[in-house]
């Protein structure tokens, strides 16, 4: 990604090498180290909590794992080489490194865009077509879609292997090696425009339309009431009182489920909005430079574009922690599990509500949890221990 705005063909004129300001180098190294370091740790934690926590293995979280892996690839392949470039002022990874690192950069970028598109479509089906979701929004299908996404982007990004080469610029005081193009801008500019349309414009238009439909269902449509709730005439009969209690419990559970889905949708919508905003400077620069005879390459603005990209790849775990109680609890458990002292397990009794699905592999699109309160205690209960085990069942709101 360091060659987006491009090194041109090899230069042979002996001119003094442009000196990069020291403050620019210091700011670049510090920002990239902090953002990429935190982002790498955060995305690794996302992958670990979903893989190690059974109740977190949902179709939506499966797509978030794919997004986390793609973001990791961007942070490592695009962010860290930026540090060496700032220190040495030259490409130090050789020809093979030029091909492989650039390939991984665009693979991560495009896979993250496709992962966002995938979970947007999954959310739309789950909320707007709940009957179809039982068969379409499953964990096994999500894994197949993710495999297809990575296979498609892996093949698509192979074109960079045929476009790149090492460019050597000779100056009076130094020889600078850069990872650039073996073709002129007239040939690679259409590739950038196609990339811009396929992996930015189309996903953002699709996300805008689908989240509009989702918002209409979740936030604008009236929530249907439970007809069983109107049972005041049964108060004097003990059997009818139990039915009334179960009716209220069911209605509260329904409201909790709707609230949970709203919270999940808000979180994913924030991810999409930040993706659109933080990628806009770089994508705009690419489009503008495609039509300029001399590309705009001001150092500080290029740094701003890169920092926005790194922020986009690093900020998602923070969003999950702030907006999802499940992820917050899972992150806390991952950090504290090994340090937690041995204590007597606390016993809880809660009533469980399940949706019946035909196959055990067909999970609901999110775990519809309930808050543990006295309201949900009933005659049929399940006891479990609050221990630091991977198989622990956690009840919280998304």
From Swiss-Prot:
Extracellular side: 1-28, 84-99, 169-193, 289-296
Gene Ontology CC: plasma membrane
Listed name of the protein: Thyrotropin-releasing hormone receptor
Glycan attachment residues as annotated in the record: 3, 10
Pfam families tied to this protein: 7tm_1
Chain ranges on the Cytoplasmic side, renumbered to this chain: 52-61, 122-144, 216-266, 320-398
Gene Ontology terms describing biological process: phospholipase C-activating G protein-coupled receptor signaling pathway
Disulfide-bond pairs as recorded: 98-179
InterPro entries assigned to the protein according to its UniProt record, in alphabetical order: GPCR_Rhodpsn, GPCR_Rhodpsn_7TM, TRH_rcpt_1
Its job: Receptor for thyrotropin-releasing hormone (TRH). Upon ligand binding, this G-protein-coupled receptor triggers activation of the phosphatidylinositol (IP3)-calcium-protein kinase C (PKC) pathway.
Gene3D superfamilies: Rhodopsin 7-helix transmembrane proteins
Membrane topology (UniProt): Multi-pass membrane protein
Keyword Zinc listed: no
GO molecular function: thyrotropin-releasing hormone receptor activity
Keyword Lipid metabolism included in the entry's annotation: no
Similarity remark: Belongs to the G-protein coupled receptor 1 family.
Transmembrane segments: 29-51, 62-83, 100-121, 145-168, 194-215, 267-288, 297-319
């Amino acid at each position: 990604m360091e060659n987006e705005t491009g090194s041109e063909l090899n230069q042979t004129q002996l001119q003094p090498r442009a000196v990069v300001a020291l403050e620019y180098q210091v700011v670049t190294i510090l920002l990239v180290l902090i953002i990429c370091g935190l982002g790498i740790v955060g995305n690794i934690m996302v992958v670990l909590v979903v893989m190690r926590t059974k109740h977190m293995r949902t179709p939506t979280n499966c797509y978030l794992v794919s997004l986390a892996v793609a973001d990791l690839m961007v942070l490592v392949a695009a962010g860290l080489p930026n540090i060496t470039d700032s220190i040495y002022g030259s490409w130090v990874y050789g020809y093979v490194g030029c091909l492989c690192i650039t390939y991984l950069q665009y693979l991560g970028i495009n896979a993250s865009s496709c992962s966002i598109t995938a979970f947007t479509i999954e959310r739309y089906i789950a909320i707007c077509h709940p009957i179809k979701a039982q068969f379409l929004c499953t964990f096994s299908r999500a894994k197949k879609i993710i495999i297809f996404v990575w296979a498609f982007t892996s093949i698509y990004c192979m074109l960079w292997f045929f476009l790149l080469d090492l460019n050597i610029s000779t100056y009076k005081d130094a020889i600078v090696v850069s990872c650039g193009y073996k073709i002129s801008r007239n040939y690679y500019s259409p590739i950038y425009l196609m990339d811009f349309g396929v992996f930015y414009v189309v996903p953002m238009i699709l996300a805008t339309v689908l989240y509009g439909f989702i918002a209409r269902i979740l936030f604008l449509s009236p929530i249907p009431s439970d007809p069983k709730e109107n049972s005041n005439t049964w108060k004097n009969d003990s059997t009818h009182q139990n039915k009334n209690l179960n009716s209220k419990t069911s209605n509260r559970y329904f409201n909790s489920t709707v609230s949970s889905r709203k919270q999940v949708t808000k979180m994913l919508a924030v991810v999409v909005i930040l993706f659109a905003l933080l990628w806009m400077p770089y994508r705009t620069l690419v489009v503008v430079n495609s039509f300029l005879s001399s590309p705009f390459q001001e150092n500080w603005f290029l740094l701003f574009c890169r920092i926005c990209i790194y922020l986009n790849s690093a900020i998602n775990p923070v969003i999950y922690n702030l907006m999802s109680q499940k992820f917050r609890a899972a992150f806390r458990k991952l950090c504290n599990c090994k340090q937690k002292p041995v204590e007597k397990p606390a016993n809880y009794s809660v009533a469980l509500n399940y949706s019946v699905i035909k196959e055990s592999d067909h999970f609901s699109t999110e775990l519809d949890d309930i808050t543990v309160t006295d309201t949900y205690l009933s005659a049929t209960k399940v006891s479990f221990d609050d221990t630091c085990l991977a198989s622990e069942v956690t009840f919280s709101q998304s």
